[in-house]
């Protein structure tokens, strides 16, 4: 007795072309050897491919419906259109059928974050144990009770974290970064891998703070057994020769002498846009003293038209030695406490 292709796919004899495609998709995924480790999986995978190749082809299906498998393969279906007898022989490579069905793309990509029909996310797929329970089929290929207990969900790999170092000038003005990553991708056979490079474009917005995260969902390595990891870039400030950052404020350290700290001085304060602002200090500069220039800091992330402040801190340089006469003058004029 020949093979019952309809039974193999789990469909009725009058099934539509769309029903045949859906059935093949479910059964091929179910019995793919990379997903199903049972001893019979390879043979079932091959049978499913052969059944689909016959039933999805109108001429083969018509002959099969009339004469069965023996007639299809034995030439009972008349001529092939060129004067010869039509005979069908399965090519023997179910993986080729599998790859062709998925259009040459990654055949497992439905598990890796793309959207499926009906708006359902692929990371909602149930793939461990009974990997195709979401389709309403049991492991033997026939419809099952939808109230049965579902298996566990496919897990996503942990995020891959990269530091993205940016200068204060880039934060001040905003910029575009292009980051090259290499990741593994499944080949159409669903088993082997290739290494693929990709350029990820990051728009650095004005005023972004250190620690800001930019996430590229599921751009990590592909495997048949997990959802690709998210690629995450975390903003990290580069050291600056003049400024330190304090949120949206920037800090400039002015170095002055002890005499200037006591007697007053004038300094030129640089700004982020390359200008300098003159500042006169008449007060005695005490430890921790700051001056503030409003609106000369970094843009606010949520309102880049407004900016933080430029803070001036003072670093007083003390002499290594002073003469005895200078000490006497200081003792005479400086308060004891």
From Swiss-Prot:
Oligomeric form and interacting partners: Homodimer. The C-terminal section interacts with the C-terminal tail of OPRM1. Also interacts with SDIM1.
GO cellular component, one term: cytosol
Keywords: Cell membrane, Chaperone, Cytoplasm, Membrane, Phosphoprotein
Modification sites for Phosphoserine: 122, 148
GO biological process: chaperone cofactor-dependent protein refolding; negative regulation of transcription by RNA polymerase II
Main function: Probable chaperone. Stimulates ATP hydrolysis and the folding of unfolded proteins mediated by HSPA1A/B (in vitro).
Compartments where found: Cytoplasm; Cell membrane
Domain J: 2-70
Protein known as: DnaJ homolog subfamily B member 4
Molecular function (Gene Ontology), one example: unfolded protein binding
């Amino acid at each position: 007795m020949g093979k019952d292709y309809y039974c193999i796919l789990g469909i009725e004899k009058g099934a539509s072309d769309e029903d045949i495609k859906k059935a093949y998709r479910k059964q091929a995924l179910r019995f793919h050897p990379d997903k199903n480790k049972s001893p019979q999986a390879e043979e079932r995978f091959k049978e499913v491919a052969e059944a689909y190749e016959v039933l999805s082809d109108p001429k083969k299906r018509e002959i099969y419906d009339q004469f069965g498998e023996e007639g299809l393969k034995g030439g009972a279906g008349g001529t092939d259109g060129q004067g010869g007898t039509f005979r069908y022989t399965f090519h023997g490579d179910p993986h080729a059928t599998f790859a062709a069905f998925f259009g040459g793309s990654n055949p497992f990509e439905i598990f890796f974050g793309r959207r499926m029909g009906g708006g359902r996310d692929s990371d909602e797929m149930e793939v461990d144990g009974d990997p195709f329970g979401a389709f309403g089929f049991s492991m033997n290929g026939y419809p099952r009770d939808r109230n049965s207990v579902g298996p566990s969900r496919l897990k996503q790999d942990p995020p891959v974290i990269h530091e993205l170092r940016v200068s204060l000038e880039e934060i001040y003005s905003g910029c575009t970064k292009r980051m090259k990553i290499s990741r593994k991708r499944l080949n159409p056979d669903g088993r082997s891998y290739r290494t693929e490079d990709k350029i990820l474009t990051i728009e650095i917005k004005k005023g972004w703070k250190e620690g800001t995260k930019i996430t590229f969902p599921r751009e990590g390595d592909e495997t048949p057994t997990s959802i690709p990891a998210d690629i995450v870039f975390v903003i990290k400030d580069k050291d600056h020769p003049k400024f330190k950052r304090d949120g949206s404020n920037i800090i400039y350290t002015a170095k002055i002498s002890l005499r200037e700290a006591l007697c007053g001085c004038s300094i030129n304060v640089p700004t982020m846009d390359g200008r300098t602002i003159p500042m006169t200090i008449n007060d005695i500069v005490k430890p921790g003293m700051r001056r503030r220039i409003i609106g000369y800091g970094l843009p606010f992330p949520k309102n880049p038209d407004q900016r933080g402040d430029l803070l001036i801190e003072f670093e007083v340089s003390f002499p290594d030695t002073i003469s005895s006469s200078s000490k006497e003058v200081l003792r005479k004029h400086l308060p004891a406490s």
